[in-house]
Amino acid sequence: QSAHIVGASMGGMIAQTIASEYPDRTKSLVSIMSTTGARHLPEMTNETEGNFRNFGEGNFGEIDVEQMHSYGFYPESMPRQLTAIFHAGDRSEQVKNINVKTLVQHGANDPLLPPDHGRHTAELIEGSKLVIYEGMGHDLPPEVLPTIISDMLDFFGET
């Protein structure tokens, strides 16, 4: 059996790994606001880095942690997630080996992984399609989400 593999951010890194290691089980890949981990790519902004450092140290400031839990987000897990992301290293060679139909979706205003991360991913995967969305950062904003989903469904229809 095979499936369309979709992942966003760290989930995109995981989806890339699945597509690389299990191409026979992957119908297609959608990598959203993710990265190859290449060290030459632009880093996050200083402000964003400071915010992540606060999360990593358990300083959630004015965040309503219970409300975040209701959305399925657990800020307490951020230190583990950040450790995994930063220790994943440069996966460019792995990403270059992806040989399934791929859509790369990325925000034009992503402060965590600037658009060059999406561009680099698309450049490495032969035949991939890249879409950069205005008004999207490192999130899935309600104003842009219908277009993201529509593009994804069109892509699946082509597969």
Residue ranges and their predicted role:
Residues I98, V104-H106, D110:
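Short beta-strand/loop motif that positions the catalytic acidic residue
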Residues S128-T159:
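Catalytic active-site module of serine/aspartate enzymes centered on a nucleophile-bearing elbow/loop
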Residues P111-H117:
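Conserved alpha/beta-hydrolase "acid-adjacent" motif
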Residues T26-K27, S128:
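Core-facing hydrophobic residues within beta-strands of well-ordered domains
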